[in-house]
Design a protein with these regions (language model features):
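Alpha/beta-hydrolase fold active-site loops
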Residues: 173
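Bacterial N-terminal signal peptides that target proteins for export
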Residues: 3-22
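Lipolytic serine-hydrolase domain surface
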Residues: 39-149, 166-168, 189-193, 197-205, ...
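Short substrate-entry loop that stabilizes the transition state in hydrolases
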Residues: 184-186
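Hydrolases whose catalytic domains are alpha/beta-hydrolase-1, hotdog thioesterase
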Residues: 262-266
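C-terminal motif of bacterial Sec signal peptides marking the signal peptidase cleavage site
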Residues: 31-32
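The conserved beta1-alpha1 loop
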Residues: 176-180
Length: 440
């Protein structure tokens, strides 16, 4: 008998096993010693700098406050903390639905402070993010989508609240944000609020929070990989519920990192479930608009197996790739499975798939292309919202759903692949002024 995870004494010690074991030990040490980092407001997109585009000019005075109300759906079990209701790491068998309020800044932050931090270089203006309140409104069995007449009173109230906000929004659209690994419920709610805020508070934000742990070791040993995969049923249920019971014209999805595992599988499941329907009819019924895979941590082969289904269900599919995403490089080296969808290494295979299947609604944004002309790369794992150039494209895309040539992106030599040129700030500001006609 030998200990689990240790090579038996009669077998030669495998160098790859030793490397992974060493990494596990180092990650355990780092996660045990590292203090949780406070969440801070993302840098202002370059799109808004210089005052050429004001995303908040249209807001009524009542909405100019340093708080954001969002909706949420989670298959985390609820827990009571010192701050009140929240959701922990235990897996729930039901979908918990509710609303949360996120504070952008501290108790002394005024709207003018938040406004300044949202449209300028934030040196000295970093603002913390925290949950102000959480209110659960309903629970729903995973795997069921029922007619409105059969909804509980609580569920009807939840969808009625979404519809009330849709009626007041400039865009009658919902953004479902699916977070990555190593984060908690607060993180998923806060990032949803940030994205909604920086997009001009023009649609309804909804956080889908799956039960990831708050350390990378659980992901490395694939426990949270399995949790991500197992959460696809809950996300598929949510998307059907939103299509059935809300007035949203479009339901957009932003999947980040391991959230792409949840999202790609959920969309593939929905296509399989309704395989007898044409893509046109299903797309019209589910009303899934733009689906973004940002820094996606999904094995390329798995993702390509699902990409046809994703295309069938969505109006527009956007994949971001980088040549210097430290998290995806580490995942490829230490977890196996080959290139990740969000790596530049996967770009040629993705481009070939798109061309081979004659797909016209998928675009790839290579954030590393053009780096020599720009004088810098767009790197790291959080680049899609932390770097002010690519975050500009994300908020512009979510606000408008425009094609890349109308968002200020440059066309590469490869079909379907776009990048940010050295004059991107001027290009995106010019595009926004033209497309929005002076009004965000």
């Amino acid at each position: 008998m030998h200990l689990q995870g240790k090579p038996p004494s009669h077998c030669p010690v495998n160098a790859d096993w030793l490397k992974r074991a060493w990494l596990c030990c180092m990650l355990l040490l780092m996660t045990a010693c590292a203090a949780p980092q406070p969440l801070m407001l993302m840098p202002a997109p370059v799109l808004y700098r210089d005052g050429l585009v004001d995303p908040f000019a249209h807001l009524l005075p009542a909405r100019r406050i340093p708080r954001m109300s969002i909706f949420y759906a989670t298959n985390r079990e609820p827990e009571i903390t010192e701050q009140g209701l929240s959701y922990g790491n235990d897996i729930a068998q039901r979908l918990h639905l509710g609303q949360a309020v996120v504070q952008l800044g501290d108790e002394n932050t005024q709207w003018n402070d938040l406004y300044e931090a949202s449209i300028t270089d934030q040196t000295g203006l970093l603002l913390p993010l925290k949950l102000h309140s959480v209110a659960q409104q309903a629970r729903f069995p995973v795997g069921m989508a029922v007619p409105s007449a059969e909804l509980t009173d609580e569920a009807q109230a939840y969808f009625a609240a979404i519809n009330a906000e849709l009626a007041e929004a400039q865009d009658r659209e919902i953004l479902v944000y699916v977070h990555g690994t190593k984060v908690d419920f607060l993180n998923s709610a806060a990032l949803t609020a940030e994205i909604d805020h920086f997009s001009g508070r023009d649609y309804v934000g909804l956080a889908f929070a799956w039960p990831s742990h708050q350390n990378i070791f659980r992901y490395l040993i694939r426990e949270d990989v399995h949790r991500a995969q197992a959460s696809s049923d809950a996300l598929a249920t949510l998307l059907e519920l939103l299509a059935e019971h809300t007035d949203a014209q479009r339901i957009n999805v932003l999947a980040y990192s391991a959230g792409a595992r949840v999202t790609s599988k959920a969309l593939d499941q929905l296509r399989t479930k309704y395989s007898d329907e044409s893509a046109y009819r299903l797309k019209s019924r589910l009303r899934i608009g733009t689906v973004i895979f940002a820094a996606a941590d999904v094995e390329l082969e798995t993702f390509l197996d699902r990409l046809g289904s994703i295309s069938d269900l969505s109006e527009q599919v956007v994949i971001t790739v980088s040549d210097d995403d430290n998290a995806l490089i580490a995942a490829r080296h230490y977890m196996g499975g080959g290139s990740r969808t969000g790596e530049e290494l996967a770009e040629s295979a993705e481009e070939f798939f798109i061309h081979e299947h004659q797909i016209t609604n998928i675009e790839i944004i290579d954030v590393s292309a053009g780096k020599l002309a720009r004088g810098f790369d767009i790197s790291g794992h959080h680049y899609w919202y932390r770097h002010p150039w690519i975050s500009s494209d994300m908020v512009f895309l979510l606000r408008t759903g425009l094609r890349p040539d109308r968002r200020g992106l440059a066309f590469s030599e490869l079909e379907g692949i776009w990048y940010l040129s050295d004059d991107y700030p001027e290009q995106v500001q010019r595009a926004a002024k033209k497309e929005m006609r002076g009004s965000w």
